[in-house]
Amino acid sequence: MSQGTLYDKVWDQHKVTTLPNGQDQLFVGLHLIHEVTSPQAFGMIKERGLEVARPDLTHATVDHIVPTANQDRPYSDDAAETMMAELEENVRDAGIQFSDPTTGDQGIVHVIGPEQGITQPGKTIVCGDSHTSTHGAFGALAFGIGTSQIRDVLATQTIAMEKQKVRKIEVTGELDEGVEAKDIILEIIRRLGTEGGVGYVYEYAGETIENLDMEGRMSICNMSIEGGARAGYVNPDETTYEWLEETDYFQEHPEKFEELKPYWESIRSDEDAEYDDVVEIDAGELDPVVTWGTTPGQGIGIDDPIPEPEDLADDKVDTARRAQKHMRVEPGETMEGYDIDVAFLGSCTNARLPDLRRAARIVKGREVADDVRAFVVPGSQRVQRAAEEEGLKDIFEEAGFEWRNAGCSMCLGMNEDQLEGDEACASSSNRNFVGRQGSKDGRTVLMNPRMVAAAAITGEVSDVRDLKEVTLA
């Protein structure tokens, strides 16, 4: 097993005891909750006459079901209104801080935690959402959990888990223009597979990772689960510290920053740390990556041919055939020129301010293609305000994009933003499963934000490197 890694250090520091079944009971430093996975858990503890153990270490928001076009209450969707009302009641009764739309701090849970400064290195963080691994970008151990585990954390502020192995993914090389963090993680998943990380936590390291901004690191850690890993993380460094120092929490508590920084530095993986596996990726060889199929692992470079199913591993042949039939693609073709109907720029993977800035540089002075629905959904109200102050909203709207309010939106079919029929969508989100965006016949092509912008302008999957970027004022 691994030794001397950040994962080992933080795990051991938070271990309360080892249970008879061999699992470790861990103290949870931050519990993030939202409206979809928490109601049943609250109901369970109420039935037992229990209270929330640590409301001060619990933070709530609404993101999955919240409409992005019109957020006036009551919501037009009765189910969404019911979930929102239940969450409001539960957090009020328990005294839990709630970033709801009236606060100006609402947004996707994996966007608001970091931007408010409550996501910190060395914390154990859980949330009833599979993309909780996003917070690992800060050197936290962050895990998605199910309803029964949410119940346990609400009641005890602890969780029972099995310790995983650690795989170091060393990424080197300078990224080509138009290639982003999203392309790195799509390539990792393509190479290792959607089940390649089962039993592992991924440590992302190497000069390429170190040169990424925090938003890029979050994009990579966000999709660890798509690669089968239980979590993913990056060792904290000066980029991390500079980002955190500007957040509300540390602006209000500067003494805490100075107090915690030595601890953050101490949890970094040792130079001689031992890993269970090491994988090397040369990111300098990457082109923009897009998916051709119905799993995030079915990706190719924009210039590469769609594979022949028979050339894949035996257990992937039938899946590839079904995916190609659903997506209406043929082996040997490239994805460049694939017609799209919708362009979605949003999600907890790619809806932060730098994502929107990069996309705006492609969009500025251009127009969305005829017959394409294109919209931008900022990851949080803070991102939304900042983007509007910078003039990004105007750039997108002048090009023909819809500018929406913060929420999960079309990343998943749980709100009003959904594909219709067999529409094809260029999406900056994290999953392209059949039916993921609301229609069982819908087709999703995952790509980085600038590639989404390029697809919106051209009406087809295009190589963003062929479009000149415009300098923003």
Swiss-Prot record:
Residues that, per the record, bind [4Fe-4S] cluster: 348, 408, 411
Pfam family membership, one? Aconitase
Query: Might you give the EC number(s) for this enzyme?
Result: 4.2.1.33
Alphabetically sorted, this entry's keywords are:
4Fe-4S, Amino-acid biosynthesis, Branched-chain amino acid biosynthesis, Iron, Iron-sulfur, Leucine biosynthesis, Lyase, Metal-binding
- Which reactions does this protein catalyse? (2R,3S)-3-isopropylmalate = (2S)-2-isopropylmalate
Question: Quick one: signal sequence residues?
Answer: none
Instruction: Tell me the disulfide pairings in this chain.
Output: none
Q: In which pathway does it act?
A: Amino-acid biosynthesis; L-leucine biosynthesis; L-leucine from 3-methyl-2-oxobutanoate: step 2/4
Q: How does it assemble?
A: Heterodimer of LeuC and LeuD.
Protein name in the entry: 3-isopropylmalate dehydratase large subunit
Q: Which organism is it from?
A: Haloarcula marismortui (strain ATCC 43049 / DSM 3752 / JCM 8966 / VKM B-1809) (Halobacterium marismortui)
Q: Which gene encodes it?
A: leuC
